[in-house]
């Protein structure tokens, strides 16, 4: 008993010290400047998919993605930021708060009056996989576990991650201006409300994009639980993540205005992709003007995630029915800019009820309060003109519930089923919001480019927008536990998506192994 107590104490001290050590050394917030400097942080993969300047203008014209002749420099930067920032924020927030298996479910010990000691229970199941039971593992008992989960995200808020549409609108353009480009003579659809009143004809141009975000996460988690008393457990869960992300964007410039021939722009359009950019040279070789291009970026990161500390106390422990209360504390030990962590402390009080039998039902409810994180701020990328960026913002709070049962199929085998649900509050969500074009102008044009000529009304194009709302994330957990030998238990489980909220995989497989000392 003394050796087991010392072992448990040393293991928990080591794991807890490690978690605080990583917390103390976590990375400070950085941004994706889009000023020619590339960042290797995964949070910058989406903003940098078009290169180090995005759709901005580089000092060296050959580094600009868009053609920047003497007549007019391209102005799509703010449109780019406003269209893609919601995707980046949603991916960052939701990929950094992944579910983990229960840190202390396994073999339970009951007092044997004949042996006058605690012995493994033979008439109970091996416990839940995602949920918890109200009983503890016993005084000076130690539970060690390891699990692996694989996340292959296929949708975000119901949007297929292989085809996320986004329209990049032209910025408002003042008149008068240094280029002496006059207002469009046909101001239809150019209004004060949308910021285009008095603008030149070329603000009708836009860029339609279709975007594929390939995001996978391998999660390896180490668990330890130690019984302080017969009613009080302390647990620590340390996840180690490998995050792989690849972004591909197919972009098409839609020219809705004609540049005067005297200006000499490629194809007599105001906006086109830059033929002199080395990245675009091969794609644009057969196009004049170059209006279609594909861009890509990829990266990966490996490191410790957010460490979770748990204390659980059994308030009532009857012959079969038990009630417990506890608290989870999530430490921001993972690098949020690489989607390894949330960047914020989270505190979740919870309550558990469970019943001990061959079929053992259990239920858990909790509410998590989250702090501020860089991921929820507006300073990841340069802020659009006229806005004030914030370094951090509040991560959404959430209500969590788990309801299910574990069934002792045979002496060594347990089947577990749970409904795992979350309700996120004041959380960013992507929604489909079609873009209404500003119409099309066709020649003839005069030398100033102010004449619209023949005007055709605009049509709708697929686009996304960000709203702040409350939504649900619901999953079903199906799994098996098998006692391989003695106190060694192996686990297999799968989480199945039941609704469309959040960043989701259709199925999340889990394998694990644990041992009770």
Predicted regions and their residues:
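Residues on the lipid-exposed face of transmembrane beta-strands in outer-membrane beta-barrel proteins
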Residues: 126, 130-133, 144-148, 222-228, ...
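Transmembrane beta-strands of outer-membrane beta-barrel pores
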Residues: 148-154, 238-244, 306, 315, ...
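Extracellular loop and loop/strand-boundary signature of outer-membrane beta-barrel proteins
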Residues: 129-131, 206-210, 293-298, 334-339, ...
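Repeated loop/turn-to-beta-strand initiation elements of outer-membrane beta-barrel proteins
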Residues: 153, 232-236, 318-322, 359-363, ...
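Outer membrane beta-barrel transmembrane domains
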Residues: 161-180, 184, 263-287, 292-293, ...
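Outer-membrane beta-barrel biogenesis signature
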Residues: 29-193, 432-434, 449-454, 467
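Outer-membrane beta-barrel translocator domains and adjoining extracellular loop/strand segments
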Residues: 156-161, 247-253, 325-328, 335-343, ...
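Residues that define the transmembrane beta-barrel architecture of outer-membrane proteins
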Residues: 126, 138-140, 216-220, 302-307, ...
């Amino acid at each position: 008993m003394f050796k087991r107590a010392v072992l448990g104490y040393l293991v928990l001290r080591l794991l807890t010290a490690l978690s605080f050590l990583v917390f103390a050394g976590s990375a400070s917030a950085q941004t994706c400047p889009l000023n020619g400097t590339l960042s290797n942080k995964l949070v910058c993969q989406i903003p940098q998919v078009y290169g180090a300047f995005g759709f901005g203008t580089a000092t060296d014209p050959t580094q600009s993605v868009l053609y920047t002749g003497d007549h007019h420099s391209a102005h799509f930067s703010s449109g780019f930021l406003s269209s893609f920032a919601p995707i980046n924020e949603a991916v960052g927030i939701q990929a950094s708060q992944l579910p983990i298996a229960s840190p202390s479910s396994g073999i339970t010990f009951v007092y044997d009056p004949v042996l006058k000691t605690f012995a493994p229970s033979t008439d109970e199941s091996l416990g839940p996989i995602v949920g918890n039971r109200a009983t503890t593992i016993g005084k000076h008992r130690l539970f060690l576990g390891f699990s692996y989960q694989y996340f292959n995200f296929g949708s975000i808020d119901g949007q297929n991650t292989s085809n996320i549409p986004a329209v990049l609108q032209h910025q408002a353009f003042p008149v008068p201006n240094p280029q002496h480009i006059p207002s469009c003579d046909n101001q239809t659809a150019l209004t004060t409300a949308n910021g285009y009143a008095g603008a030149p004809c070329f603000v009708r141009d836009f860029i339609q994009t279709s975007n594929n975000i390939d995001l996978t996460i391998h999660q390896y988690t180490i668990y330890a639980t130690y019984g302080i008393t017969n009613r009080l457990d302390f647990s620590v869960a340390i996840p180690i993540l490998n995050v792989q992300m690849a972004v591909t964007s197919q972009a098409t410039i839609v020219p809705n205005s004609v540049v005067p021939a005297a200006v000499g722009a490629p194809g007599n359009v105001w906006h086109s992709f830059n033929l002199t950019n080395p990245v675009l040279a091969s794609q644009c070789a057969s196009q004049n003007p170059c209006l279609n291009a594909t861009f890509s970026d990829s990266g990966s990161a490996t490191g410790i995630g957010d460490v979770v500390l748990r204390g659980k106390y059994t308030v009532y422990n009857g012959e079969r029915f038990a009630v417990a209360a506890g608290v989870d504390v999530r430490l921001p030990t993972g690098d949020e800019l690489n989607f390894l962590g949330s960047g914020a402390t989270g505190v979740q009080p919870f309550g558990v009820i469970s019943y001990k039998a061959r079929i053992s039902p259990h239920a858990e409810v909790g509410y998590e309060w989250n702090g501020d994180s860089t991921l929820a701020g507006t300073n990841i990328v340069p802020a659009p003109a006229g806005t004030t960026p914030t370094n951090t913002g509040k991560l959404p709070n959430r209500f969590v519930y788990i309801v299910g049962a574990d069934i002792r199929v045979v002496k060594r085998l347990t089947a577990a089923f749970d409904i795992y649900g979350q309700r996120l509050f004041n959380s960013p969500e992507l929604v489909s919001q079609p873009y209404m074009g500003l119409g099309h102008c066709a020649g003839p044009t005069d030398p100033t480019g102010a004449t619209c000529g023949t005007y055709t009304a605009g049509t709708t194009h697929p686009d996304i927008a960000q709203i702040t709302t409350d939504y649900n994330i619901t999953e079903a957990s199906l799994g098996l536990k098998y006692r391989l030998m003695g106190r060694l238990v192996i686990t297999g489980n799968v989480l199945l998506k039941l609704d469309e909220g959040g960043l989701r995989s259709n199925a999340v497989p889990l394998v694990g192994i644990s041992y009770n000392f």
